[in-house]
Regions:
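Surface-exposed, charge/polar-rich loops and edge strands
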Residues: 1-334
Length: 334
């Protein structure tokens, strides 16, 4: 299977630059036996008593830092993950090498020192700062918005789901951005169970597929946690099992043993693309419209069927749906 099989043309004006208000006023394309055009708030009507909705409660950390080198040159750093006694970072700037010191925050009080160059703008660094790194990031860090979003986000909470809890993602699980607390309340009132899983979105979100053959791509590890309670709720589902987002699908598939969800804490490199055999019993998934040639588009193609999905994307473009992180949503039934 070739990477070009997952390419499509999207007019730039359809790339959403900001979220809609309220959250659930975004458009919803329902892909079932036919295509329906709705608002996200209408999703309540597709749930029935006995269904279970699974949500990823990961919270985005303000992991993007903007600062200067000792020479005064501008630099940006994205904190990716813990790495031994240091942290793995993506750093944008010229002449970054081992021993380089970078300065962030008021009067450059937070100092980052490069201790290893791993190539492709990836570095292992150590921090010299007063207080915990988590607290420092909350004070001086920014939401790590995707590069295709050029507009400044005034309200950082709009890049968080209303139910986000567990800190650790460097990108939002965007399918969940459409939910409001009121919408979740209405869904529960229908007799729908809600289960939470955690998958921290990692560097793989920013890593393009460079292999010509899709099968040759290797995913970066992502942290997953599913509690015994959540596994029980999911396994006791008598109606439809609905997963909100590609991250939730990946978490469920990564923790499924003999058709049952098991409690899990660890890392997953699971790569889902067409011809993958789903085992967790997901009946429907909620997702946004994804970038061409991305692993997220491949996952959704595996779930919906590539030709079926690309026909839906073509109709979405014709109907001026908004794409990507702050864009509109799909509800896809298998």
């Amino acid at each position: 299977m070739k990477i070009r099989d997952f390419d499509y043309h999207l007019p730039k004006e359809l790339i959403a630059q900001s979220p809609v208000e309220p959250r659930d006023s975004s458009r919803l394309m329902v892909l079932n036996k036919s295509i329906e055009h709705r608002r996200f708030s209408d999703i309540v009507g597709y749930f029935e008593e006995g269904d279970t909705l699974v949500l990823n409660d990961s919270r985005v950390i303000p992991a993007k830092l903007t600062g200067k080198k000792s020479t005064g040159g501008h630099v940006e750093a994205l904190i990716v993950s813990k790495s031994g006694t240091g942290y793995e970072c993506l750093i944008r700037g010229k002449h970054i090498r081992e021993g380089t010191r970078l300065y962030f925050g008021e009067l450059g009080a937070t100092v980052l020192e490069v201790i290893k160059n791993e190539g492709a703008s990836r570095y292992v660094v150590k921090f010299n700062c007063n207080g915990s790194l988590s607290d420092i990031l909350e004070k001086i860090g920014d939401a790590p918005l995707p590069p295709y979003i050029k507009q400044k986000l005034e309200d950082r909470s709009r890049y968080q789901t209303v139910y986000s809890k567990e800190k650790g993602s460097i990108a939002a699980p965007t399918a969940g951005l459409h939910f409001t607390n009121e919408l979740l309340r209405r869904i529960k009132e229908k007799g729908v169970s809600i289960a939470y899983v955690t998958l921290h979105v990692g560097i793989g979100t920013f890593t393009p597929v460079k292999a010509e053959n899709v099968e040759d791509h290797r995913m970066e590890p992502e942290y997953i946690s599913i509690s015994t309670e959540s596994a029980g709720i999911i396994n006791e589902t008598t109606g439809k099992l609905v997963a909100a987002g590609t991250t939730t699908v990946k978490a469920l598939e990564s923790s499924c043993v003999n058709g049952k969800i098991t409690a899990k804490e660890g890392f997953s490199r699971l790569f889902i693309y067409p011809l993958y055999s789903f085992s967790s019993g997901i009946d429907a998934m909620i997702t946004n419209f994804h970038l061409p040639q991305s692993t997220l588009l491949m996952l959704v193609s595996a779930f919906a069927g590539r030709e079926r999905l690309f026909a839906a994307y073509s109709e979405a473009i014709s109907n001026s749906y908004r794409f990507y992180s702050f864009g509109d949503a799909m509800l896809i039934f298998r």
